[in-house]
Amino acid sequence: MKLIRGIHNLKKINSNSAVSIGNFDGVHLGHQKLLSNLYKIGKKNNILTVLILFEPQPLEFLNNKNSPKRLTTIQNKIKYIQSWKIDIILCIKFNESFSSLSAEKFIKNILITKLNIKFIIIGDDFRFGSKRNGNISLLKEIGYQYNFKVIEISSLLYKNKIKISSTNIRKCLLENKIELARKLLGRPFSISGRVIHGNKIGRKLGYPTANISLRKNIPLNNGVYAVKISCFFNKKFVGICNIGIKPSYFSSKKHRLLEVHLFNFNLNLYEEKIEVFLYKKIRNECFFSSKNKLKEQISKDIEIVKKYFNLI
């Protein structure tokens, strides 16, 4: 897979291509359906497959203060997409100049002139171009003129009633429906980061933790979760995590933090990049007035998590 950052780095492709376009935030089951079709069409017609992403995502640029909270960072998004064996990911910088590009110019200047498009695979709600004026009808009209085919993929529904979309997955997470979010994503929702040094309070209580500083725009409530983490060549370990500002008798932190305690684990994770997969919310974050009350609650939480994972 080749990653091209920015239109200025895109050279004209001489061979034909199949293209898909979108934010692909979360790379959920609906996105995976698009990626699967893109791969199959490329393989069947022996042409290059190209996926166009935007960074930042359009609403993050156009409406920064009220933009949707991200399900995936650009790094994780690309990591998940890699498994679909797409030939080229074109990551376009979404800025003032690009946002003012008309739908017609986007098709002609990028899809036709640069990518030599023969197929475009898009979702049934796809809009593009300045002020979102471009739609599937326009694509089909220009496709007829320039000899490329538009393949419209219908939205997936979970149990024939819930549309699988990034919006609905964010809604599930913020309503603490972690298990439903997992079903719409096709995998557990996850948070990645590098393990930082903490104040070692957990270690003093007998429950050492690996800590990750969280970005502000994660669509997740504070609380305690049943988790698995991936580290050391993607090996997975079971544990429990707290997300929040740790509001207990000794807290002085103001920034948001993820703290994960792993069961039967004694390896050093400092400076390691880990991915934390959330399976179920156990409870909300609470204030504890004493060390003993906190320790007692942690013990109860761990028992709940171990039962959830059938470890006891």
Swiss-Prot record:
GO MF term set: ATP binding; FMN adenylyltransferase activity; riboflavin kinase activity
Protein name: Bifunctional riboflavin kinase/FMN adenylyltransferase
Primary role: Catalyzes the phosphorylation of riboflavin to FMN followed by the adenylation of FMN to FAD.
Keywords associated with the record: ATP-binding, FAD, Flavoprotein, FMN, Kinase, Multifunctional enzyme, Nucleotide-binding, Nucleotidyltransferase, Transferase
UniProt EC number: 2.7.1.26, 2.7.7.2
Domain of life assignment: Bacteria
Catalytic activity: riboflavin + ATP = FMN + ADP + H(+); FMN + ATP + H(+) = FAD + diphosphate
Encoding gene (name): ribF
GO terms, biological process: FAD biosynthetic process; FMN biosynthetic process; riboflavin biosynthetic process
SUPFAM superfamilies found in the cross-reference section: Nucleotidylyl transferase (SSF52374), Riboflavin kinase-like (SSF82114)
NCBIfam families: PRK05627.1-2, PRK05627.1-5, PRK05627.1-6, ribF
Family to which this protein belongs: Belongs to the RibF family.
InterPro entries: FAD_synthase (IPR015864), Riboflavin_kinase (IPR023468), Riboflavin_kinase_bac (IPR002606), Riboflavin_kinase_bac/euk (IPR015865), Riboflavin_kinase_dom_sf (IPR023465), Rossmann-like_a/b/a_fold (IPR014729)
A Pfam family per the record: Flavokinase
Pathway noted in the entry: Cofactor biosynthesis; FAD biosynthesis; FAD from FMN: step 1/1; Cofactor biosynthesis; FMN biosynthesis; FMN from riboflavin (ATP route): step 1/1
